[in-house]
Amino acid sequence: MKSAYDDSAALHLPDRIRNDALAFRNTVEAYLRNEMTEKEFHSHHVGMGIYEHREKGRFMVRVRIGAGIVLSGQLIRIAELSHQYGSGILHVTTRQDIQIHGVTAPHLADVVERLLEVGLASRGGGGNTVRNITACFGAGLCTDELFDVSPYAVAVAEYLLQNERSFMLPRKFKIAFSGCEKDCALASVADTGFFARIQDGKHGFTVYAGGGLGVNPRVGICIEEFVPAENVFAVAEAVRRLFDKYGNRANRNRARLRYVLADAGEEAFRELYRQEREILREQGLPGEIPAIRKKIPHVPNGRAIPVPLVLGHITADALTVVAETALRFGTGEVRTTQLQDLLIPNIPEEVVPRVLGLLSDAGLGKGANGHPKIVACTGASTCRLGICRSRDLAQAIGDHFHACGIVVDNASSPVVRISGCPNSCAAHQIAEVGLQGSGRRINGILVPHYTVYVGGSLSGQGARLGEKVATVPARRIPELLADCLANGKIDPVKLRMRAPHYEEPPADLPETYWRDFGSENAFTLPGRAHSTAPAEHERASK
C-alpha cells in the first residue's frame, strides 16, 4: 500500500540554514584556491557538520535528521550522494544523524547543495552549535509513551535554527525529547532534556538541564517540574541564552553547560534559568514561532519494522532499498535510532512478510545475529579525536563469540557501548556495559586499553552513570565479555567482579598487544584525542 506522501513531519529548514548552505561554496572555492589556510577552512567546515577523516583530503558530512524522522526521497538522495561523491557506506549515529563518508574537498559544496534540494542540511552538525535535536525513535508508535514528542522536537529545532546565536555558542548544545520514563532519547543526560508529562489532562514536559557525557559527565537537574507544551520554545531559548551568556569561552575543556551548573551550584543555576525566562516574558520570544505540525498519518494496525544494522553501517544500495520499501508499503517515512539502527513505521500487517523478504534480499535484518548488540563510535580508524579503534574491537568481539560458538540473546542481553575516547560518542557512561578507549604503558610499551563501565541506566526519575571497575588491555576485552555470560546474556554483575582480574597482561607480553584491533602498526597517541581530557589518554601501568 502506498500512502499519501506528506512531508509535514520532517524538519523544515529555516532560511538561515538554506542561506548558510548556499554560501558554503564560496568558502570551499577560496580554500581550493589556497586563499584560506587549513585552520581557517576547519573553522568554517566544522560548523557545517563536516569533519576531515584521518585520511587527509577526505571528509565526513553529518546530515541532520530532526527527531530521527527522514523521508524516502531524502534517503534516496543521501544514498545517491554517497555513491557519487563518497565511499558508498553510510553511518547512522547515536544522535540520529546520517553520515556520508569519504567526500573530497572539491565536492563538499555539491553535497551540501544537493542535500538542500530535498530539505536536508548538515549545518550545525558540528562545532559550537545547537546540534541535532533528538526524540524517541518510537515517538508516535510506542505504547509506553504519554504522547508523541516528535512534533515538539522538530518545532524547537526549527525555532532555534533561525537564530544566528545558535551557531555562536561556547560549545556544542544538545537537546532531547523523551516520551516516557524509559528515556530512549537520553534526555536525562542532555544539555536540555524534555520528558513528556500530562497534568490535569494537559500535555507538557518536565525539563532537565546541565546533563552531558564525556569528561566529567553528569545527569541533568530538574529546572521545570511541569511546563505546558506550548512553552517549549521559551524554555529552550532560555537555556540556550543562559549557556550563551555564562558558558566558559576561555577554556574549551570547561565550555559545556554542565560546567556552568557545576560552578554555580544547582539552585543558582536554576535562578539563572528563571532570570532568562523572565526576560523572555517581558520582551517576548524573538523570531517566528513554528507550528506544532501533525505527523504523517499512521496506518491502522500498522507495524514498525526494525532494520538492525551492524555498528550503524549501511551501504548506499541497501539504504535505497529501505527508502523504496518505506514508500511502496508504508507512508514514506523512516526513523533513525539512538542504537544506530533504522525503523520503518506504518507497514500494514498483511505485507510484513514481503517487506522482510525485500530487506533480507538486500542483506538487511540480521543485525548482531547472535552476537552482543554493540553501539560504537567511528573510533580512531577515521576519527581524528579517537584513541582506540572502537569499531574494530566490536568486530573482534563478534568474531570471538562466533569462534567460541557463543550465541547471545539480544532481547535480554545489555547493549555494549564502545567509545574510542573519553568523549562518549557511544554513550558508554550510561550503559549497563560500557567501554572507553585509552592508552597505558606496560613495561615501557604503549598498549591500547579500555576502561570498563558497569551499571549505568537511563530514567526520567533519575539516570545513573556507570561505575569504572577496571582498565583492561584491548586484546583481552573479547575474552572478558565471553567470560561474563549467564543464561545467554552478558551479566553486568559478573563483569564487575571479573574485570579487575583481566587488568594484568601476560608476563611475556605478546606483540599483538602493542597493536590495536584492525591495525598492523604499533599503537601510538600523537595527533589523537586532542579535544578534551588529555590527562586520561596515557597513564603508566602500576
Regions found by a protein language model. Give the residues of each.
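Peripheral terminal and linker regions in Fe-S/redox and tRNA-modifying enzymes
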Residues: M1-K542
